Design a protein with these regions (language model features):
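Alpha/beta enzyme core
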Residues: 1-60, 68-89, 122
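Glycine-centered helix-coil hinge/cap
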Residues: 53, 94-95
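Short donor-sugar binding/catalytic loops of nucleotide-sugar-dependent glycosyltransferases
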Residues: 64
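C-terminal extensions of enzymes
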Residues: 87-88, 95-133
Length: 133
């Protein structure tokens, strides 16, 4: 069973996780609920990926609300994303059907974003697609 460590924001913490046997990390600031000044997860993807290399699992959790957010995470180095709050909104809205609706919307937005950026597959999602405002 793979072991993933959640709540990682610092490169040195990521290294410690792997030195101690973790199979991957989950970049998370716990939705900003713990510390209102916590670093946004999106800003930590690149430094963490640089620290751990391309072969280690890096999942992003936090702040993902749209398909464009998914593309940004992948472009910056995430292997996968986790979503929480949007799923809860869907669950509250209409139970299982609401969750399915939220997931359908996110998938459609992500595919649309890939099309609009000229990406035919995940391998074509690259760092140059993301710019800071």
């Amino acid at each position: 069973l793979p072991v993933l460590v959640k709540g990682i924001l610092r490169p040195d913490d990521a290294s410690l996780c792997f030195e101690n046997g973790a199979d991957g990390i989950i970049v998370s600031n716990h939705g900003g609920r713990q510390l209102d000044t916590a670093t946004p997860t999106l800003k930590q993807i690149e430094p963490l990926r640089k620290e751990i290399g391309k072969d280690k699992i890096l999942i992003v959790d936090g702040g993902i609300r749209r398909g464009t957010d998914i593309l940004k995470c992948i472009a910056l180095g995430a292997d996968a994303i986790q979503i929480g709050r949007p799923v809860l909104w869907g669950l509250n809205y209409s139970g299982k059907e609401g969750v399915e609706l939220v997931l359908d919307i996110l998938i459609k937005e992500f595919i649309e974003t890939m099309i609009l950026t000229g990406c035919r597959n995940l391998n074509e999602i690259t760092r140059d697609l993301v710019r800071e405002a």
